[in-house]
Amino acid sequence: MPLLTLTTDYGLRDPYVAMLRGRLLSRFPHWRTEDISHNISKYDLVEAVYVLKTAFPFFPPGTVHLLDVGYRSKNQENPWPSFIVVRYQGHWFALPDQGLLPLLVDRDESPLVQRYPLTVSRPNAGFALLDWLVAYRGLHAEPLQQCHYLQHNQAMVRHMM
């Protein structure tokens, strides 16, 4: 049974984690989901990646890790970012394409990365991952392409920190 983990800043007081889990169950009924954390500080992408990077090695290879933290792009034409799917150390990661990958992977490794745009015009109350999951045709459906994403985004990460 495939395993999927969730790391979000949704918190636990509102229905949002249940909404995400319901969407996942509807889309991937045979997958088991586990929570890494839903108490990431609001909008703290760096904290979210740190928590995920610390936890993922304890899960079996082949696990899919979803990371969704509140954010918006500065691009006025499309304020909702694309997501990237990354194959790294035997795990799969789906996270916003916000320059976070260099924080997740070691410098000497070249992960496989594929970018997927958010294809809905009005994301559901800011929960872009919910909408992206509905539009996405399957986590392993398309072959991932080798790229040099890590080197390309080093300057952006240094600027963030």
Regions from the PLM with identified roles:
Residues 1-39:
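N-terminal glycine-rich anion-binding loop in soluble enzyme alpha/beta folds
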Residues 3, 27-34, 43-51, 60-69, ...:
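Active-site histidine-anchored catalytic micro-motif
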Residues 9, 70, 142:
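Conserved acidic functional residues
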Residues 11, 15, 35, 58, ...:
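Residue-level preference for alpha-helix termini and adjacent loops
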Residues 35-48, 145-150, 156-157:
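N-terminal auxiliary interaction/assembly segments of multi-subunit proteins
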Residues 121-161:
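Anionic-ligand-binding alpha/beta catalytic cores of soluble enzymes and soluble regulatory domains
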